[in-house]
């Protein structure tokens, strides 16, 4: 049995990462990013998920989250987002991505013709304030390290936009202190 990435204390904040299969660039359109943010909002309102920080990159996202049913909430978030992405991509003329999501579907995934997300979400419990600050810095600076922006607050699809610049964010975070 795998034990490296498990949620043992769901109310504890966890750093999570979810990636698109084969690192395909799904989140290169505003609408696909917005689908993920809508799913965050749904899980906050209906499942008690707290989202303390987040960033969306072209093929994955990172977040710091907590909630009473964390594994189920993340699973539902990914299912909802996958359905929306599969509906949205053809509208954007990105049928090639839909074809890739079908091609790279894991053989044991028989309930769908496509697989959008890699399995799992790699939860890491945040046990100290120092660890929280390190994960916040990692999330904030991900677009900077990729060379997409000069400063974290310039990335629209990340919580640094709100926290560091005081700008209206695409999705507002829950306080962690």
Predicted regions and their residues:
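Short catalytic/metal-binding and nucleic-acid-binding patches
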Residues: 1-177
């Amino acid at each position: 049995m795998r034990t490296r990435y498990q949620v043992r204390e769901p109310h504890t904040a966890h750093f999570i990462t979810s990636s698109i299969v084969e690192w395909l660039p799904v989140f290169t359109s505003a609408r696909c990013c917005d689908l993920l943010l809508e799913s965050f909002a749904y899980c906050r309102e209906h499942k008690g998920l707290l989202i303390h920080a987040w960033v969306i990159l072209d093929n994955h996202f990172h977040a710091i989250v907590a909630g009473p049913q964390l594994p189920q909430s993340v699973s539902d978030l990914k299912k909802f987002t996958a359905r929306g992405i599969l509906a949205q991509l053809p509208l954007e003329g990105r049928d090639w991505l839909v074809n890739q999501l079908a091609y790279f579907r894991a053989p044991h995934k028989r309930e769908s013709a496509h697989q959008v997300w890699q399995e799992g979400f790699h939860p890491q419990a945040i046990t100290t304030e120092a660890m929280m600050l390190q994960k916040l810095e990692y999330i904030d600076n991900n677009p900077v390290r990729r060379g997409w922006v000069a400063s974290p607050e310039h990335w629209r699809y990340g919580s640094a936009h709100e926290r560091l610049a005081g700008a209206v964010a695409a999705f507002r975070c829950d306080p962690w202190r």
